[in-house]
A protein has these predicted regions:
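Polybasic low-complexity intrinsically disordered regions
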Residues: 1-170
């Protein structure tokens, strides 16, 4: 049995690490919770049950309710022509929170997709999802740089190749 690492045809600086995805996902979820608290302070009721994991469907529902509320506010503002209209500042605040929630929702979807791509690995390349980052022998600067690669295992018997396999793990 002989093994060698073959470089993938992928950009060596296009890596995605599992630990970073998990860390950024936690930060994103805490930011979403703080945005929902801001919505509650703006008198927009969007209570989440305690110890509930945020899902994309929950955020879709909240954003849809927020858009409907904004439509109602727009109609109310068009009817009333008060100069210092408090509804305008409320609308401004709700629009800002809706935009931020949509941004966080896209990030949540991105992290969910990344977690699905990982499988059992700890890294993958953005340009070649099957490649895993490994240390390879062709390291010209001898600094232990990681590059996207595949692990090729070859089984031989009396100098004849009997089997081979390409794996993602080093």
């Amino acid at each position: 049995m002989d093994g060698t690492k073959i470089l993938a045809d992928a950009n060596k600086y296009s890596f995605v690490w599992r630990k970073n995805t998990i860390r950024f996902d936690k930060l994103n979820r805490s930011a979403i919770i703080s945005l929902l608290e801001e919505l509650n302070e703006a008198k927009f009721k969007c209570q989440l049950p305690a110890e509930t994991d945020l899902t994309l469907e929950m955020l879709d529902e909240i954003i849809l309710r927020l858009e409907n509320n904004l439509k109602d506010l727009n109609k109310k503002i068009e009817k009333e022509h008060n100069s210092p209209n408090p509804d305008k500042s409320r609308r401004r605040k709700l629009k800002s929170l809706k935009r931020k929630l949509k941004l966080r929702q896209t990030k949540l979807l991105e992290y969910k997709i990344q977690t699905g791509i990982y499988g059992k690995r700890n890294s993958y390349s953005k340009t070649d999802h099957d490649a895993t980052f490994m240390r390879v022998k062709e390291d010209s600067m001898l600094n232990g740089q990681l590059k996207p690669a595949y692990n090729l295992q070859i089984a031989t018997s009396k100098q004849f190749v009997t089997a081979f396999g390409i794996f993602q793990n080093p």
